[in-house]
Amino acid sequence: MLLTQSYFCIMSMLGTLARLGLTALNTYPGAPFSGLLWVQFVGCVIMGFCQTESVFFPRPKHNATFLLAITTGFCGSLTTFSSWMLQMFTGMANLDPFERRGRGYSFLSVVSDFMVTMCIAMSSLIWGKQIGKTTGQWRIGKVAFAWPIPAHTHIVVRVLLLLLSICFFVGAAFYTAYTTNVTHRGIGFSLIFSPFAALTRLYLARFLNSPQYFIPYGTLCANVFATLLLSIMYMIPQITHCTPVSRSVMYGIQNGFCAVLSTLSTFSNELHTMPIKRAYIYCIISVAISFSICVIVDGATAWGHGYTEKY
C-alpha cells in the first residue's frame, strides 16, 4: 500500500507539471487549437501504449503497481475531464464584450470542441495501443532498445521511493510557502493538491468501478465532482475580490485537485473497452451532467450577476 501511494504521489505531481507545461507551451496568439488538446493527446497515447506493451512489462501482474501508477497516476493526472468541460462552456458562453457572436456560433463552438477532443482522445488511445504492440521490434541488428523492467521492487527501492515522494511533496510545500512569485505559488499549490486528488480517484475506482456495474461509477463520480468544484473555483474570483494568495490557492485547486481528480485518458479507455451501447450511454451521461453543471454554476453567474472581476 505504501509503495502504491509513493508511486501515485510522484506520478501525480509529474503529471500535473507535464500538463501545466504542455498547456503553457501550446498557448500562444494565433494557436490553431487549445493547448489543452495536446495534453489529452499525450496522455491518451501513453495510456494506450501501456495497455498493449509486452517488452517493458512482460508480466503485467507482477508490474501491476508500476503500471497502475503510470496509467491511473501519471496519465490520469496529465489528462483532465473537468478542464475540458469548462473550456466547452467558456467557448459557448460568449462572454467577451468586444467579440460578440450569434447564438448559432456558440452551439458550433460546443460541438466542435466536443468532437475534436473526443476524436483526438480516442484516436490517440488506439495509436498508443498500436505503438505498444511494436516494442518487440525496437532493435537494430542484435541491439535492442527496449528492456524488461524488474517485476519485483527491492525493499531498498521501496524505501527510497517513499522518501523521495515525501521529499518531493515537502519541497513543493516549502517552496510554495516562501516564494514571492505568484505564478510559481499557483503551480506549487497545484503540486500540493495533486496527490490527494489522484489517491481519491484511485479509491473511487477501486470501490465503484466493478465489472458488475453497468458503467464505471467511480470515474463518473470523480469527473462530475471535479467539474462541480472547478466550476465553483472558476466562478468565485470572477465575482468578488480575492487576495493574491487566495487566487493562488484557487488556481491550485483548479489545476491540482480538480484537473487531477478528473481524467480523460481513463474515460477514453473505458469507452474503448465497453460494449458499444453502454459506452454511448456512459459518454452521454458523463458529458451531459458535467456540462450542465458548468452551465448552471458559471452560466447563471455570468449571465445573471455578471463577471465584475478580471481573473
From Swiss-Prot:
Topology versus the membrane: Multi-pass membrane protein
Reaction(s) this enzyme catalyzes, per UniProt: fluoride(in) = fluoride(out)
Keyword Metal-binding set for record: no
Sequence ranges on the Cytoplasmic membrane side: 1-6, 51-65, 128-154, 208-212, 269-278
Glycosylation sites per record: N181
Any Pfam family matching the protein: CRCB
Chain segments annotated as transmembrane: 7-25, 30-50, 66-86, 107-127, 155-175, 187-207, 213-233, 251-268, 279-299
Disulfide bonds: none
One biological process term in Gene Ontology: cellular detoxification of fluoride
GO molecular function per UniProt: fluoride transmembrane transporter activity
Protein name as catalogued: Fluoride export protein 1
Species: Schizosaccharomyces pombe (strain 972 / ATCC 24843) (Fission yeast)
